[in-house]
């Protein structure tokens, strides 16, 4: 694992996830569309950690978002060091790092990186199904390939649909014009993906999305920062108006925790170079905090708040 200037939210650093309940991994790069070129979100893990540098000094403070105190048993295992000239090797290293966390009995929380990161992340759950993917994103992400690349950031949900251990999918926050063509929308719906648009969430809240999750399901949560409105998180590569609000996503996470078990979580597509104020990183980092708390209190979750 790579070294860190600071850990996420002041959680202790550890190279070994054994004994932890939740283990964070930074993943700057996975699969670029331009060979040898680092991701537009490669700096995001460091930005997410830096956004909460003061948070580690306040573990005894009450957190009103999570309704309690920060969970115990959380460690930051640093970054998975990849090689942008060797995407297959990088994906294998990501999958191996996540598998190591799972084998240690901890829940992995991944700080991406772009939206190609969920593919090797999900791959680590082979043999651990059946799983439901709950995605927050402005885009469908069902492209089979882009310029011959099948593992890039337009394809994570397509690749997830091909993994036998993933049996359900709920996609929340879609809006506007993105990468999806008519064929991809048809394929997603034919496979059984439940699509909940951003407009539906604005009209009815996150209840309709939560209704698509089977009680007791084991869920992988993936949050693309562009799923939120650019007024909330402007630091993304693909801005689109009409996105989800911060508390939509918080309510979704805690709603999931009340009816399902969250077995893995990732956040991707923060673009630090479009975030000069650091507000996007702060907002995204707080979503990660809520994700950690939701993992901790979900049925069968590993830890409780302290």
Regions picked out by a protein language model, each given a short descriptive name:
Residues 1-306:
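Conserved alpha-helical scaffold segments that buttress catalytic/binding sites
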């Amino acid at each position: 694992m790579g070294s860190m200037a600071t850990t996420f939210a002041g959680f202790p650093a550890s190279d070994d996830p054994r004994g932890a309940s939740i283990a964070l991994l930074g993943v700057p790069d996975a699969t670029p569309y331009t060979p040898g070129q680092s991701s537009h979100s490669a700096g995001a893990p460091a930005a997410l950690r830096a956004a909460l540098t003061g948070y580690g000094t306040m573990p005894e403070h009450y957190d009103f978002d999570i309704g309690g105190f920060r969970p115990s048993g959380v460690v930051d295992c640093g970054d998975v060091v990849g090689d942008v000239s060797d995407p297959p090797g990088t994906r294998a290293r990501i999958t191996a790092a996540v598998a190591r966390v799972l084998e240690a009995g901890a829940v992995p929380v991944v700080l991406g990186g772009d939206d190609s990161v969920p593919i090797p992340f999900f791959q680590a759950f082979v043999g651990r199904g059946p799983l439901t993917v709950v995605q927050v994103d402005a885009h469908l992400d069902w492209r089979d390939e882009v310029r011959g690349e099948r593992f890039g950031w337009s394809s994570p949900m397509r690749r997830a649909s091909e993994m036998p251990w993933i049996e359900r999918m709920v996609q929340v926050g879609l809006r506007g014009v993105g990468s999806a063509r008519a064929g991809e929308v048809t394929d997603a719906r034919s496979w059984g993906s439940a699509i909940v648009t951003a407009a539906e969430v604005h009209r009815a809240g996150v209840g309709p999305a939560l209704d698509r999750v089977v009680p007791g399901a084991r869920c992988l949560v993936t949050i693309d920062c562009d799923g939120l409105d650019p007024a909330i998180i402007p630091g993304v590569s693909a801005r689109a108006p009409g996105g989800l609000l911060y508390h939509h996503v918080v309510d979704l996470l805690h709603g999931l925790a009340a009816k399902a078990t969250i077995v893995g979580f990732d956040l991707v597509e923060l673009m630090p170079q479009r975030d000069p104020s650091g507000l996007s990183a702060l907002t995204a980092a707080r979503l990660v905090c809520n994700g950690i708390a939701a993992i901790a209190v979900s049925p069968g979750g590993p830890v409780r708040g302290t």
